[in-house]
A protein has these predicted regions:
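A short, terminal or domain-edge coil/loop segment
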Residues: 87-90, 125, 169-173, 241-255
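A short local loop/turn or secondary-structure capping micro-motif enriched for an aromatic residue
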Residues: 136-137, 169, 283-288
């Protein structure tokens, strides 16, 4: 089997755990995922099966959507409720104050990654250093917040929920901590659910036990999404029979042979088979293969 299955990752599972489960269900070792989710987080985890694993590192849609819960007046070493509590303090923030502060983070922002993250500094993952009690300086990283909605805010308990659409690499727990800092208080994330990632959403996601039941009924193929759906943001080109043969035999086509402008394209054979991604250079009359999927 080849394709993409969108998994609704359960809490207490690492992304690797999910892949391990699916290797058993799909009976293949060729499985990978895109967009790691923290163990306590739930939601959309795109998993790639068979030939589709070639797409893991080239997904074009970097936007992600999250629903997160938070509580003000508490600070942990991980910036989420599952870490060690470092500080507690009284917090007196109104809903209007929180909304105003949060809206100030729309657009381009900079974040200092948390120590408990998979980012590498001098070849070492930050969380490995953090577990040894070592804290190192982390350079700021750019991120973009496309949408930030306050779903609710409980002034009495100083807690609430937000919905965020953001760029790849955005840390929601850091965003919550930074909003709290802007309000001269502290805050931590108490829950996280990914609603969308890489163009895939919860509406097309399967729980692991649902996939197991589909396998038992011989309907596992119904859970798979074709690999080319991940690249629908690109225009498509369909080759005739001769050029399909040339393409599949490694011949580099000229840009004028396929009538393309400067862009990245999904390439299909004459029989509608998804062949891969192609980049064109009209000025040089060249094409460059990004990835083959046949």
């Amino acid at each position: 089997m080849d394709g993409i299955v969108v998994v609704d990752k359960p809490a207490d599972f690492t992304s690797f755990d999910v892949c391990a489960k699916l290797r058993g269900i799909f009976e293949t070792k060729r499985i990978g995922h895109a967009g790691t989710l923290d163990p306590m987080a739930t939601g959309v985890l795109p998993v790639f099966i068979g030939k589709a694993t070639k797409a893991c590192d080239i997904l074009p849609n970097g936007k992600k959507a999250y629903t997160a819960s938070f509580k003000l007046g508490i600070k942990t070493d991980t910036e989420d409720i599952w870490g060690e509590v470092l500080k507690r303090q009284e917090s007196f923030v109104s809903q209007n104050e929180f909304v105003a502060a949060a809206k100030g983070f729309l657009g381009d922002i900079k974040q200092i990654p948390p120590m408990y993250s998979a980012i590498k500094i001098n070849g070492q993952k930050l969380y490995s250093l953090a577990r040894k009690g070592i804290e190192v300086e982390r350079p700021e990283r750019e991120a973009h917040i496309y949408q930030l909605d306050i779903l609710n805010f409980d002034e009495k308990n100083q807690s609430g929920d937000i919905y965020v659409i953001c760029s790849k690499g955005t840390y929601i727990r850091t965003l919550i901590s930074d909003i709290a800092s802007k309000l001269n208080t502290i805050g931590t994330m108490t829950a996280l659910r990914r609603d969308a990632s890489g163009g895939f959403s919860l509406s097309e996601a399967f729980k692991i036990d649902e996939l197991q039941r589909l396998k038992e009924k011989g309907e596992l193929q119904n859970a798979l999404i074709s690999t080319d759906k991940a690249f629908e943001c690109f225009e498509s080109i369909t080759l005739d029979e001769k050029r399909t043969w040339l393409y599949k035999n490694g011949v580099m086509l000229r840009a004028d042979q396929i009538g393309a402008k400067d862009d990245t394209y999904r390439v299909y054979g004459f029989n509608s088979e998804f062949l891969g991604l192609l980049q064109t250079d009209v000025k040089e009359n060249k094409t460059k293969r990004i990835k083959n999927f046949y």
